[in-house]
UniProtKB/Swiss-Prot annotation:
The gene is Mis12. It is found in: Chromosome, Centromere, Kinetochore. Its main location: nucleus. GO terms for biological process: attachment of mitotic spindle microtubules to kinetochore; cell division; chromosome segregation; kinetochore assembly; mitotic sister chromatid segregation. This is Protein MIS12 homolog. Component of the MIS12 complex composed of MIS12, DSN1, NSL1 and PMF1. Also interacts with KNL1, CBX3, CBX5, NDC80 and ZWINT. Belongs to the mis12 family. InterPro entries: Centromere_Mis12. Pfam families: Mis12. The keyword Nucleus does not apply. The lineage of its organism: Eukaryota, Metazoa, Chordata, Craniata, Vertebrata.
C-alpha cells in the first residue's frame, strides 16, 4: 500500500484513497477465500463418488492451500499495479487544482513564515490579555478596599457629629471643648466604677 498520506484527496473525498483501496483489497481477498472453499467442497464431493480413490481429504486440503497461495501471490501482484494506477490517475487531485474552500489561497497566499508570525502575534495578545486581566482584578480589589475605607470614614464622621450634638446639648458649642468634657465625664465614670468595686470588695470581706 502507498505511504503517501494524500491529505488533500482525503479532504475532498471524505476518506483516504489508501483506505478505499484497502477495503477493496480485503473484499477481493475474502471473495477469493470463499471461492477456494467452495471449489474444495466440490472436489471432495467428486472424490467421494470415485470408488477406491487414493486421494484423501488432507491431500486435497494441502493442494487447495497451495493453489490458494499461488492465486494470492498473483492477485497481490496485479492489485499492486492496479493500486498504483488508481492512486496516480483516478483518486489523485492534480497539483494545479484547488478545492473551492481553498480558493482564497490563490488570491491571498499564506506562507509558513506568515503563519508563524500570526501565531507569535496571538501569543503576545494572550499575554497582554493576561496582564490586563490581572490589572483589572487588582483595580477591583483596590476599589473594594476604598469602599470599606469610605464606609469606616462615614462611621467616624457620624460619630463626631454625634459628639458635637452631645456638646451642644450640654451647652458647649466648640467641638474641642465637647471632647474635653467627654473625656472628663469618662474619667468620672471610671472613678465611680472603681469606688463601687472597692466598696463591693470591702462589704464582701466583712
Amino acid at each position: 500500500m502507498s505511504v503517501d498520506p494524500m491529505a488533500y484527496e482525503a479532504q475532498f473525498f471524505g476518506f483516504t484513497p489508501q483506505t478505499c483501496l484497502l477495503r477493496i483489497y480485503i473484499a477481493f481477498q475474502d471473495h477469493l477465500f470463499e471461492v477456494m472453499q467452495a471449489v474444495e467442497q466440490v472436489i471432495l464431493k467428486k472424490l467421494e463418488g470415485i470408488p477406491d480413490c487414493e486421494i484423501s481429504s488432507i491431500q486435497t486440503r494441502k493442494c487447495t492451500e497451495k493453489f490458494l497461495c499461488f492465486m494470492k501471490g498473483r492477485f497481490d501482484n496485479l492489485f499492486g499495479k492496479m493500486e498504483q494506477l488508481i492512486l496516480q490517475s483516478i483518486l489523485q487531485i492534480p497539483p494545479n487544482i484547488l478545492l473551492p474552500e481553498d480558493k482564497c489561497q490563490e488570491t491571498n497566499p499564506f506562507s509558513e513564515e506568515k503563519f508563524q508570525l500570526l501565531k507569535q502575534e496571538i501569543k503576545e495578545l494572550q499575554e497582554k490579555y493576561k496582564v490586563e486581566l490581572c490589572t483589572e482584578q487588582a483595580l477591583l480589589a483596590e476599589l473594594e478596599e476604598q469602599k470599606t475605607v469610605k464606609a469606616k470614614l462615614r462611621e467616624t464622621l457620624t460619630f463626631f457629629d454625634e459628639l458635637e450634638n452631645i456638646g451642644r446639648y450640654q451647652g458647649t458649642s466648640n467641638f474641642r471643648e465637647s471632647l474635653v468634657s467627654l473625656v472628663q465625664n469618662c474619667r468620672k465614670l471610671q472613678d465611680i466604677r472603681d469606688n463601687v468595686e472597692k466598696e463591693g470588695k470591702r462589704l464582701e470581706t466583712q
